[in-house]
Amino acid sequence: RSKYELGTGELKSSEIYFEKPEIFLELARFISKERLPLLVELVDKKYCVATSIVNHHIMPPYYMPDESDGRAQYIRNGLADYLTANLPDGVYRSFFKACKQPTEENLLSSMSELKSFFEGEKQKLDFAELTVKSIDETIDDYRIMKSRIGERAAIEKFVPLPDLTARGVKVNLLPHVHSIFNLIARLNKYHLKNISDVTLFHDKQKDFDHILMQCKEYLETTEVSENIPPVVNSDFDLNESLSLEFVDSEDCVGVQVADLLAGFFNRYVNGLLYKEVDVNEIYHSIFSEFRRNFRPMSPLGVNFVIPASKQQIIFRKFNF
């Protein structure tokens, strides 16, 4: 703090990133030199929503063949990539409405608008016609399920289920959920399933603590299906339970440092890949320093939950 005149308050990435980036460079060099384990989930929220649309309206898993070879997931990722870049806001709003008010009318309207979008893409998109057929099949699947298990239960198969806060408030499409799932699974792989002595510290989340704890307990009690796409950097099959503690970030320097790191990766990738601004060379040097300890198939490093088209830009730049 004295070296960089930071004062005694809580460390804030939003201030340090632009005003004193050399702090990140020193931090990156220290982490690299000491070979400290670094696990980051870098999430494009719009891409997560697009992925949910694909999973529920285009390629729901209910009648899919064996997915363990990863081919179906590869197709899903490609569709989500395209939707992120091209789907009109109105179609997103229709999907949100179906999530918040899951009625048959809203569900079918959401699917219909998505189908209309791809029908309009047939002249320029080689997979548009197949996607339209997939949506038609999803609508048929819904009607079949409705006849078997009833309308309400069937609707819930084709929209993402909301998470519930401790007060019973519904929260739709919370990105924290997939991030905590992935982090725990990555820690499980890194520690070779021996995680009973591992404690994961998280800054207090007034509305989301309960949800994150529920996610942890779900992973610990749910048997992993063999019919899932391969995930090389994670192990979702937990034999032991880790501890998850929520702390006040003002009183925990470790959580503040984690926030600094998360803020760096978020701002760097946002500037480089999304805003496409002229990024100062020091930021490239910082990322390159972190990159030194990233290994293929390792649970350590950055998990880029962003469109593949964006991934490839940074992968080529830093030789992933």
Regions found by a protein language model. Give the residues of each.
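Phosphate-ester processing/binding pockets and catalytic centers
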Residues: 1-320
